[in-house]
Regions:
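N-terminal Rossmann-fold NAD(P) dinucleotide-binding loop
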Residues: 12-13
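FAD/FMN-dependent oxidoreductases across multiple families
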Residues: 204-234
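An acidic/histidine-cluster motif and surrounding catalytic segment
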Residues: 186
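Glycine-rich FAD pyrophosphate-binding loop
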Residues: 4-8, 18-41
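Central beta-strand plus flanking loop segment that forms part of the substrate or channel wall
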Residues: 48, 143-182, 190-194, 215-220, ...
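Conserved N-terminal helical subregion
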Residues: 56, 66-160
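Short beta-strand/turn micro-motifs composed of small residues
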Residues: 7, 30, 75, 164, ...
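N-terminal FAD cofactor-binding segment of flavoenzymes
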Residues: 38-73
Length: 234
């Protein structure tokens, strides 16, 4: 049996793993080049309960997630005292992992193929003679054509993400600051790496230097050694 999953999101990666255990061939089709997925700086936040489920069903994933014990929320007006603090007693709030690490783990399975289709439409995919096609991607052309309203609103906003390498510290508290230009989040990946997500009212991706300037303005704990390339998320 051959099954096609549309989109390289977490839902499809988990579903693919379950299908592969049943000896079903799976293709994951998207508009992203597989080479880009190998090196992407995208990260995935997973709740404590969902991470337990993934560890039970995906071999090797237990070494990929980094635990976060608290989430602290700040405002631009008062950076020294948090507005809110979220924590779960005796358990982690969530786990953060690199999408590239999960992708590289999954692609080791010889029955799973990641395919980029330039002509991304249902007629082209049907010609590949799959027994079943599953679409769980929100913004691909097929979803927009068949499942969404024709009127689309452009809110002129973009989320910029990057990973910073920094001096080793105890790094298990996520922070988000609501600034005048938009919210910025510091999401721990390890004791020496942190994911940055900054959202603003723009349709143009920020360059590395511009994002670093924003980071430095609101960063009070990391001694940064390096910043990755910037990607958009959403």
């Amino acid at each position: 049996m051959n099954i096609c999953l549309l989109g390289n999101n977490l839902t499809n990666l988990v579903l693919a793993n379950i299908l592969l255990k049943k000896k079903i061939n799976v293709d994951i089709i998207s508009q992203a080049k597989p080479s880009l997925l190998t090196n992407t700086v995208r990260t995935i936040a997973i709740s404590n309960e969902n991470y337990k489920f993934l560890k039970e069903n995906i071999k090797g994933i237990s070494n990929l997630g980094w635990p976060t014990e608290k989430i602290k929320i700040y405002s631009d007006k008062n950076k020294s005292s948090e507005l809110f603090e979220f924590k779960n007693n005796n358990q982690k709030n969530f786990y953060l992992l690199k999408y590239s690490a999960l992708y590289n783990l999954m692609k080791k399975n010889k029955f799973l193929k990641f395919i980029k289709l330039k002509n991304y439409n249902l007629d082209v995919i049907r010609k590949r003679n799959y027994d079943l096609i599953i679409n769980s991607e929100q913004n691909n052309p097929i979803t927009k054509k068949y499942f969404q309203k024709k009127i689309e609103k452009n809110y002129k906003s973009l989320a910029h993400t990057a990973i910073i390498d920094h001096k080793k510290i105890e790094n298990k508290i996520a922070t988000q600051i609501f600034t005048k230009k938009g919210p910025i989040a510091f999401l721990p990946l390890s004791n020496n790496q942190t994911s940055i997500v900054f959202s603003n009212n723009s349709t143009k991706l920020m360059d590395k230097l511009s994002l670093l300037q924003i980071i430095n303005k609101y960063n009070h704990q990391y001694k940064i050694n390096k910043i990755s390339d910037v990607e958009s998320v959403g």
